[in-house]
From Swiss-Prot:
EC number: 3.1.3.15
EC main group: hydrolase
Organism: Halalkalibacterium halodurans (strain ATCC BAA-125 / DSM 18197 / FERM 7344 / JCM 9153 / C-125)
UniProt protein name: Histidinol-phosphatase
Encoding gene (name): hisK
Family: Belongs to the PHP hydrolase family. HisK subfamily.
Pfam families recorded: PHP (PF02811)
Gene Ontology MF term list: histidinol-phosphatase activity
Nucleotidyltransferase listed as a keyword: no
Reactions the enzyme catalyzes: L-histidinol phosphate + H2O = L-histidinol + phosphate
Length: 273
């Protein structure tokens, strides 16, 4: 495969920008990419209330068919310059596995690519979007009881996302597996040793299920993170286990394509040796 970005958002994203599909594609071509996966946030399950203050986590149900139709046209328009994959970033939400499976059974056949990501953590009957803001993360810490409890819940939920039966169209690539680190400079994991153990256990599960990892550059431009998801040390462990790493910029605007590419290329190249 040539230069590929496997995690790109779109003008359909309510918390992104209105940069057009053409803007993303032209920028990708200028950067030397040969293929892109557009992976917009899939609609949240019916019955689940978006807990974010702006309630802007995902595309609406009423927009989904238009998204797929529009991308089908873009795919044809650029077919001689860029291979475009129609995809979605699907949220794993504890307690909504059945609804997610139903959604995937309906829309999975229409997709070329997909990611499975954890953004929401469950506590009793409440959910927290742990990458929304430092303020929301702080409320989660108070609710869960400690920073460690938030980190532990994140990795436990990630584990469930990997092991859950979500049907034949379940995404086989795990999105930004260390997203809980987004605000780590303000809320560092109390025990880096404990966190690394959790991360290595996740890698073993990914390996066991034959999945791949979204090697995500967005953390490099998050001021309280400053590293990829997962960080280089864990990415190298994944390579050693034979887990495929798929680069993803997680761009929410055209100019963010290739975020982290230069820093991450050595590890990406190692898996091809």
């Amino acid at each position: 495969m040539g230069k590929h970005d496997g995690h790109v958002h779109t003008p359909f994203c309510p918390h992104g920008t209105k940069d057009s599909f053409d803007a993303y594609c032209e920028r990708a071509i200028s950067l030397g990419f040969t293929s892109l996966s557009f992976t917009e946030h899939a609609p949240l399950p019916k019955g689940f209330t978006d807990p974010t203050p702006a309630q802007d986590s995902s595309i609406g149900w009423n927009e989904l068919d238009d998204y797929i139709h529009t991308l089908s046209s873009i795919k044809k328009a650029y077919r001689d310059q860029l291979t475009i994959y129609i995809g979605l970033e699907v949220d794993f939400i504890e307690g909504f596995e059945e609804e997610i499976c139903t959604f995937l059974n309906e829309y999975g056949p229409l997709l070329d690519d997909s990611l499975l990501s954890v953004h929401f953590l469950k506590h009793s009957d409440r959910y927290f979007c742990i990458d929304y803001s430092p303020d929301v993360f702080a409320v989660a810490i108070r609710t869960f009881g400690s920073i460690q409890a938030v980190y532990d819940t994140y990795y436990r939920t990630l584990e469930r996302s990997i092991t859950s039966e979500l049907g034949p169209y379940k995404p086989k690539r795990i999105g930004h597996m260390t997203l809980v680190n987004k605000f780590q400079k303000k809320f560092p994991a109390p025990s880096t040793e404990h966190q690394k153990k959790s991360q290595l256990e996740i890698l073993q599960l990914v390996k066991k299920h034959g999945y791949s990892l979204d090697y995500n550059g967005a953390g490099f431009i998050k001021p309280l993170c400053g590293e990829s998801y997962p960080p280089e040390s864990i990415a190298k462990e994944a390579v050693a286990l034979g887990i495929p790493l798929i680069y993803g910029s997680d761009a929410h605007q055209a100019k963010a394509l290739a975020t982290g590419w230069e820093q991450m290329t050595p590890t990406l190249k190692n898996q091809d040796e």
